[in-house]
């Protein structure tokens, strides 16, 4: 899980979702998981 100020899609499987007010990227590739912080 990367904590970044700016979350971006890395590949076409990445999905940007908002969960409890936190912007996250979920993907089938575990290394692409991100959270805005």
Curated annotation (Swiss-Prot):
InterPro entries: Ribosomal_bL36, Ribosomal_bL36_sp
Cross-referenced Pfam families: Ribosomal_L36
GO biological process, one term: translation
Keywords: Ribonucleoprotein, Ribosomal protein
Superkingdom of origin organism: Bacteria
SUPFAM superfamilies per UniProt: Ribosomal protein L36
Any single GO CC term annotated in Swiss-Prot or TrEMBL for this entry: ribonucleoprotein complex
GO molecular function: structural constituent of ribosome
Family: Belongs to the bacterial ribosomal protein bL36 family.
NCBIfam families associated with the record: rpmJ_bact
Entry protein name: Large ribosomal subunit protein bL36
Species of the source: Janthinobacterium sp. (strain Marseille)
Lineage, top ranks: Bacteria, Pseudomonadati, Pseudomonadota, Betaproteobacteria, Burkholderiales
């Amino acid at each position: 899980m990367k904590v970044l100020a700016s979350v971006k899609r890395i590949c076409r499987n990445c999905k940007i979702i908002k969960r409890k007010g936190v912007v996250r990227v979920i993907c089938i590739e575990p290394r692409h998981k991100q959270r805005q912080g």
